[in-house]
């Protein structure tokens, strides 16, 4: 597994406002969208391309375009849905799948309640979206599902990560073609499994609490 922390002043600026408890939901959603686009720029550095011959208004030339099969973008519901627009803004031709996963707040274990994506992901580059890499359980389970379907190149785009979650990813996904792209690796997890200093519950801050 490879970890890439994006070091950029605009990333740090937007992340600081996201962390601020005074930031309201509409502003949080907008900033998360903008931050994901910045992270997506880094996450797609190795997106697969192929040569194409074109003619400009001046002369013929050779360029590149995204190759087939098209990349697949998979947000983890529900909070990952708030990252989708920011990702497909840079990959408008990507296909989109969905994984519905929920974490038990007592055991911190993840379970899947919904899946909508191709059964065969052989040869596909997949970008999985989840705001927080906290305990690592949800993201590990999601990526294992993608690899089971044949994905050979998975990039996880997360707003924040905790060292404990990174360690779990490195342990459970050792030797797999996985990259994690994030704006920050924070200090630690607290006793409730929240990232410290973090930004709170990303889903609740995007959409309001779900009872």
Swiss-Prot record:
Catalytic activity: UMP + diphosphate = 5-phospho-alpha-D-ribose 1-diphosphate + uracil
Lineage: Bacteria, Bacillati, Actinomycetota, Actinomycetes, Kitasatosporales
Pfam families with a match to the protein in the record: UPRTase
UniProt protein name: Uracil phosphoribosyltransferase
Organism: Streptomyces avermitilis (strain ATCC 31267 / DSM 46492 / JCM 5070 / NBRC 14893 / NCIMB 12804 / NRRL 8165 / MA-4680)
Family: Belongs to the UPRTase family.
UniProt GO BP: UMP salvage; uracil salvage
EC number, UniProt record: 2.4.2.9
Coiled-coil residue spans: none
Amino acids binding uracil: 195, 200-202
Function of the molecule: Catalyzes the conversion of uracil and 5-phospho-alpha-D-ribose 1-diphosphate (PRPP) to UMP and diphosphate.
Cofactor note: Binds 1 Mg(2+) ion per subunit. The magnesium is bound as Mg-PRPP.
Pathway in which this enzyme or protein is active: Pyrimidine metabolism; UMP biosynthesis via salvage pathway; UMP from uracil: step 1/1
Activity regulation as described: Allosterically activated by GTP.
Keywords per UniProt: Allosteric enzyme, Glycosyltransferase, GTP-binding, Magnesium, Nucleotide-binding, Transferase
Binding positions (5-phospho-alpha-D-ribose 1-diphosphate): 78, 103, 130-138, 201
């Amino acid at each position: 597994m490879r970890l890439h922390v994006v070091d950029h002043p605009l990333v740090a600026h937007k992340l600081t406002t996201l962390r601020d408890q005074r930031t309201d939901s509409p502003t949080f959603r907008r900033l998360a969208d903008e931050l994901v686009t910045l992270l997506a720029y880094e996450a797609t550095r190795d997106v697969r391309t192929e040569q194409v011959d074109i003619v400009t208004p001046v002369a013929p030339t050779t360029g590149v375009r995204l190759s087939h099969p098209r990349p697949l973008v998979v947000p983890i519901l529900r909070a990952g849905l708030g990252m989708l627009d920011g990702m497909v803004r840079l990959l408008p031709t990507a296909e989109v799948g969905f994984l519905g996963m929920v974490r038990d707040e007592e055991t911190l274990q993840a379970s899947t309640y919904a899946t909508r994506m191709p059964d065969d992901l052989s040869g596909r580059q997949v970008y999985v979206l989840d705001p927080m890499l906290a305990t690592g359980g949800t993201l590990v389970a999601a990526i294992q599902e993608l690899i089971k379907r044949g994905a050979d190149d998975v990039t996880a785009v997360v707003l924040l990560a905790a060292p404990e979650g990174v360690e779990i990813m490195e342990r459970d996904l050792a030797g797999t073609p996985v990259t994690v792209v994030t704006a920050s690796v924070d200090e630690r997890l607290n006793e409730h499994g929240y990232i410290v200093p973090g930004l709170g519950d990303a889903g609740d801050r995007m959409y309001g609490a779900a009872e």
